[in-house]
Amino acid sequence: TFFTMFTGIYTVPLEKTETGFAKNVIILIPDGMSTDGVTLTRWVYNDGRPLNMDEIASGLVRTHNSDTIIADSAPGGTALATGHKTQDKLRGIKPKKAVLYASDKNDEKDYYSPVASVLELAKSMGKSTGIIATSEIMHATPADFTAHATHRSNYNDITEQQVFQNLDVVFGGGEFFLKAEN
């Protein structure tokens, strides 16, 4: 799944530069892509030369679950969207179990409570927001920015939340879940 989320949120650099402040943010998430896979692509398909994507500013983050070292797309996307690690299958909500480093320890009253995403923050600031996905928009990573659910497969609930997010642009699959009869 390849996923893009964009916002009109302003970023604040540590120091003001001569060029000013960023006006817009576009986040590209090639879900499941690894540095090893990119390196192999350079060597096999591009004779070791840089790829076009190498010109894009990028970074790496640790998106392990709150309770296991390997994350699937839903908790991995939640970590990217909210800055909070969560458990397998959860999206956009606090975990019940948080035992690994960099995981928030929650009080029992906070289990499964929603955490705001960067997209929701941008919308609350009056910015234009949107998501673009090569999968269904209610799939794991795109939905981490636009919904809160106790299971990544709750497509009907997730879709309803996405409709009421008032996104300005939405491109992706999932038409079946957007029809009124479903």
Question: Residue locations for each model-derived region?
Answer:
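N-terminal catalytic scaffold of extracellular/periplasmic and nuclease hydrolases
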Residues: 10-181
